Design a protein with these regions (language model features):
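Serine-hydrolase catalytic machinery in alpha/beta-hydrolase-like enzymes
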Residues: 10, 16-101
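A domain-start/cap signature at the N-terminus of enzymes
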Residues: 1-8
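Primarily recognizes the serine-hydrolase "nucleophile elbow" in alpha/beta-hydrolase
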Residues: 89-131
Length: 131
């Protein structure tokens, strides 16, 4: 079966989170979470930098997820000044780790506001190996 990028909805603290997901064929592949720029300035998971980062992880055989924060696209909720978005990122990381429990490494990446949230997540989650 060919691996494809699929649309998923991850249960989040403010409702469901719209995401795109690619699962590597290797069970022990590294995982990556890619986060969007600032939602109040038009940032979405479809931002060019986010998509290119996602594709780079995919091409390097990662299982990778990019997610729209609360209130963006088809995600439920509304902007929460970074606190809620950090909780959204944690929920997305929990989801990708459950889907890939044998992962060899855990990476987070983001663009602009997404980098800020990634860094905050990194400080709270010891399983994250790379930023």
């Amino acid at each position: 079966m060919e691996n494809k990028i699929i649309e998923i909805f991850i249960p989040g603290p403010a409702g469901r989170l719209e995401a795109k997901y690619f699962k590597s064929k290797k069970n022990t592949s590294p995982v990556a979470l890619v986060l969007q720029p600032h939602p109040q300035y038009g940032g979405t998971m479809n931002n060019k930098v986010v998509v290119e980062t996602f594709n780079t992880f995919k091409e390097n055989d990662f299982s990778v997820c990019r997610v729209n924060f609360r209130g963006v696209g088809k995600s439920d909720g509304e902007f929460d000044n970074g606190q809620g978005e950090l909780a959204d990122a944690a929920a997305a990381l929990d989801w990708i780790e459950r889907e890939n429990f044998d992962n060899s490494q855990c990476w987070v990446a983001g663009f602009s506001f997404g980098s800020l949230i990634s860094m905050q997540l990194l400080m709270r989650r010891p399983e994250i190996n790379r930023f």
